[in-house]
Amino acid sequence: MAVNKVPVLKRCRSLGLEPSYLGYDKKSRRNLTRANRKVSEYGLQLREKQKAKFIYGVLEKPFRNYYKKADQMKGLTGLNLMTILESRIDNVIFRLGFARTRKEARQIVDHKFVTVNGKVVNIPSYLVKAGDVIEIKESKKNTQRMKDIVEVAGGRIVPEWLDVDAEKLQGTVKDLPTREQIDVPVDEMLIVELYSK
């Protein structure tokens, strides 16, 4: 399995992102040295794509496949792309507060901690649908790891499109998110322009 191993703060600095979007409380003490440099139109489009890939932990080939799928769906391609990325199971676990970061959520899914509608899911790219019930397996709920995670991440604000029961470590997808409910600082229209060339 290919994983991006670039240091988080270094990558956040280069993309102009706040580490809090990824679930990190760290802050960079360095100044942006290239902040005043003029960026071309292609450079802006590429940066937006890299931001989205980095935030959601998706590599180039799956990201391109998500774009193709979003392009074939009805509606706006950019909005469809963001909805697909938000509905990945690793992102949903992060949003529900069952993981501190998306990387940790991915690992929790990989290690078979998660069930969707009563069935174990161990594929981080699994896409949830409206009405799906996501739960941490009974055998994993009382582990020290899950207790530590819930203690730290449990206070996170859950988006409107999700419903969570923190006691049972269970969440429900009420509906797929709209663009207003997605708080990721990405301009998806620039990504659409990049791929439509």
Curated annotation (Swiss-Prot):
> What are the GO BP annotations of this UniProt entry?
ribosomal small subunit biogenesis; translation
Presence of the UniProt keyword rRNA-binding in the record: yes
Q: Which GO terms describe its molecular function?
A: rRNA binding; structural constituent of ribosome
Q: Where is the S4 RNA-binding domain?
A: 87-147
**A Pfam family annotated for this UniProt entry:** Ribosomal_S4
Which is a Gene Ontology cellular component entry for this protein?
Answer: small ribosomal subunit
Check the record and name the InterPro entries matching this protein: Ribosomal_uS4 (IPR022801), Ribosomal_uS4_bac-type (IPR005709), Ribosomal_uS4_CS (IPR018079), Ribosomal_uS4_N (IPR001912), S4_RNA-bd (IPR002942), S4_RNA-bd_sf (IPR036986)
SMART domains membership? Ribosomal_S4 (SM01390), S4 (SM00363)
Q: Which UniProt keywords apply?
A: Ribonucleoprotein, Ribosomal protein, RNA-binding, rRNA-binding
Please give the SUPFAM superfamilies that the UniProt record associates with this protein.
Alpha-L RNA-binding motif (SSF55174)
Q: Which family does it belong to?
A: Belongs to the universal ribosomal protein uS4 family.
Complexes and interactors = Part of the 30S ribosomal subunit. Contacts protein S5. The interaction surface between S4 and S5 is involved in control of translational fidelity.
Show the HAMAP family listed in the entry: Ribosomal_uS4_B
Function field: One of the primary rRNA binding proteins, it binds directly to 16S rRNA where it nucleates assembly of the body of the 30S subunit. With S5 and S12 plays an important role in translational accuracy.
The protein's name is Small ribosomal subunit protein uS4
